[in-house]
Amino acid sequence: IPLRLVGSEMCIRDSIIKVGIGPGSICTTRMVAGIGVPQISAIKDVRKALKNKKIKIISDGGIKFSGDLAKALAAGADAIMMGSIFAGTDESPGKKFKIKGKIYKQYRGMGSIGAMYSGSANRYSQKKFKDKSKFVPEGVEGRVEYKGNVSKIIYQLQGGLRSSMGYIGAKNLDQIKKNAKFIKITKAGFYESMVHSVEMTQKTINFKSVSYTHL
């Protein structure tokens, strides 16, 4: 799979819509503003609205595993924006620090107080405020474990996407949309999809256990 990245130096005009309000791991917009649609539903709805139009979709946020990448493309996205999955790498912003022998890196949302104070406040129409207490944040600040070089993560994302394409017989990215089929699953079905009935003894770079208590 050829790796195509969008960088800040891109300056070619194109018709693109960025889809995603609140799916990010450090975004609180859905709770603070009450705005947002589950990411896959949002992508599918926008793709349906853009039927027969030559407009590309960038899916922004909500990627936790490489399988989420495949699902977003299957739902109608042409490109994917990711943040938390790359947080903690050498290439990501943020200071490194150590807690109880573990190395972490700072990670904050664009809507967090710290980021707004550093310059992102204009994005949320709050540039006029100089006092931090006047900000109404739509993101949080936190830490993630240090992950090393980003190339390892990109390799796993490519591998997972390639595997997904193989399962559904997609020879290229366009065929993912044609060959994929979405079905609804229950809480039990989701639990079955995850690692269960065992205590993991060794970490794997492309999987992290999630809590089921909120389901």
Place the predicted regions along the sequence by residue:
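Non-cysteine beta-strand/loop elements that form the S-adenosyl-L-methionine
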Residues: 16-23, 82-83
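Structural recognition of alpha->loop->beta junctions
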Residues: 13-16, 76-78
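Feature marks short, surface-exposed loop/turn motifs that line or immediately flank catalytic pockets
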Residues: 23-25, 88
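Alpha/beta catalytic cores of nucleotide-metabolism and tRNA/nucleoside-modifying enzymes
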Residues: 34-59, 63-211
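Short, functionally important structural connectors and interaction interfaces within domains
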Residues: 2-3, 27, 78, 136
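Single conserved hydrophobic/aromatic residue that forms the stacking wall/gate
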Residues: 1-12, 212-214
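Ser/Thr-centric signal marking residues that sit
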Residues: 28-29, 213
